[in-house]
Amino acid sequence: MEITASLVKELRERTGAGMMECKKALTEANGDIDAAAEAMRKSGAAKADKKADRVAAEGRLGLAQDGGKAVLVEVNSETDFVANDVNFKNFVDSVAAAALASGANDVEAVKAAKLADGRTVEEARATAVQTLGENIQIRRMVKVDGNNTIGAYVHTNGKVGVLVDLVGGDVELARGLAMHVAALKPPHNKAADVPAEFVEKEKEIELAKMSEKDKAKPADILEKIISGKINKIVSDVTLYGQTYVLGDTTVEQVVKAAGADVAGFKLLVVGEGIEKVVEDYAAEVAKAMQV
């Protein structure tokens, strides 16, 4: 069967692969576009498997929201170059939309979710690996699902995203709080959420830093000094204790003035916790020249 330009074009639109790769697949499938597409999907999965052991610490976040439901997904790539590619951005957005629509609660469920074109997210990921030439992984997802006000924010570079679950208040306040979390990244919501082990460790550190003169003070005075320092530390690591980035009072004061309460928040930072590989290209070239 003749492999026409229109046939190649149609296969490219279906798979996102290069022209020569589409032509080769059509030739091997004797012009059967469905068989060619299926073969390319299998090939894409094989290529994806081969790239799966390469470190993917870059990427971006996808956000999807519908009323009282919102989802953030982290999709990783190997380089920032691919992370900024329009095809990668579109893929990430489609993953977030599928995660929200399917009601997925974890990454495996996200991978099984269907996209608008009928493919699963995992099938589309394998195709993206083939098309973009890098290891691409769907690493994490977080969601807020309820009847509260949601503050959703993804920083313009797509690297930091936040979902705030606000009881009472309005969307403007919720979004402002999400921006605050993105900027200052508090580990905890309120003082009650700070682990007791952390507080005890900080007490030990503050006591060790004190002069012998201060340590010799009466126990009640010493306790007040230590408590003051610990309260400051706890304020620094909690959303409620921090000074609001859009004002000059604490977040707790702002929230209470609005008659609201932050039930919790979700924060994702792309690549957080992944050890990046530092490439020494000079060493690689030198090694290659010795062969």
UniProtKB/Swiss-Prot annotation:
Compartment annotation: Cytoplasm
Main location: cytoplasm
Keyword presence, Cytoplasm: yes
Positions of transmembrane segments: none
A GO molecular function held by the record: translation elongation factor activity
Record region (Involved in Mg(2+) ion dislocation from EF-Tu): 79-82
Residue stretches in coiled coil: none
UniProt-listed InterPro entries: EF-Ts_dimer_sf, Transl_elong_EFTs/EF1B, Transl_elong_EFTs/EF1B_dimer, Transl_elong_Ts_CS, UBA-like_sf
Keyword field: Cytoplasm, Elongation factor, Protein biosynthesis
Annotated GO CC locations: cytoplasm
NCBIfam families: tsf
Family: Belongs to the EF-Ts family.
Protein role: Associates with the EF-Tu.GDP complex and induces the exchange of GDP to GTP. It remains bound to the aminoacyl-tRNA.EF-Tu.GTP complex up to the GTP hydrolysis stage on the ribosome.
Name under which the protein is recorded: Elongation factor Ts
Organism of this sequence: Stenotrophomonas maltophilia (strain R551-3)
